Every structure is written in C-alpha cells, then in structure tokens.
Amino acid sequence: MRYEYIEPLLISTMKVLDNVMQSEIRMGDVSLIRPEEINSDIAVIIKLEGDSTGGIIVNMGRETALNICNVMTGEKFKALTPLALDTISELTNMIAGNATSAINDLGFDFKILPPSSLTKEEMMTGAPWLEIFQVPLLTRCGEIKINIAMRTN
C-alpha cells in the first residue's frame, strides 16, 4: 500500500464526519489488521479503481449506526431499516467521494464505485492477503472504524 493515500483519506473522512455531526471527532490509534479482524454489525465498502485497487470500508456497531441516522435525517431510528442502511451507505459515499478527490488532487487517478454492504464471510473470503489500515474515530454517535485497503496495480 502506498502510505501517501492514508493521510488525505483520514483528513477527508474527519472533515465529512465533523460536518455531518457538528462535533469534535477524535482519532484513535492506527493499526494494521487482516480482513477477518473487521468485526461489527454494519460494514459498507466503497471500492476504488485506478492507480491502485482497493477500497474504504466503514464499519460500526448497531447503536452507532442508529445514532448517525438520527443525526443525518432528523428522524428517530430504532431499527436498522432499509432507510437507515441507505443513510449509512450515503455517509460512506460522502467519505469516499471527498477522500478520492483529495487523493486525485495529489496527482493520482482514482474513481469510486457505488457502495455495497459486506458480510464478515465475504470479507474473509474476498482477499485473505489484503492488508488493512484501521483507524477508529470516536464521535458523539459512537465509534466508527475507517479501514483503508489498497493494492498498487
């Protein structure tokens, strides 16, 4: 993975979350994990293509997702309805769009694909060789984990 992708991805992510949540976002410690270590109730991936191949995986627990949906829509969600899942996918899309623009501004060439949800089994069988940089972000809605997985073409 090219490390120069990580900083613009994280800066863009923090800006989007700050804008959406209107509160301070704190970054936890960066760690290198394997796909099978992603563990949460919800995971949404935005695949990236171009100079490198990979994706941004945003994962979180159920309560965090519901809290984010409440903030983003102004409605009170009590269950992970299709609208709630679409809201989390849209947040992931906003993160990926801003991050891709920031990386492309550095002279790289990336495009994003539409978001898709993943099961833990799909993560484990999709690319067992993949290295993932995981960064926990602490928000007023709960912990969101940003996972960056890229392979140079």
Segments the model singles out, each with a brief description of its role:
Residues 1-153:
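N-terminal auxiliary interaction/assembly segments of multi-subunit proteins
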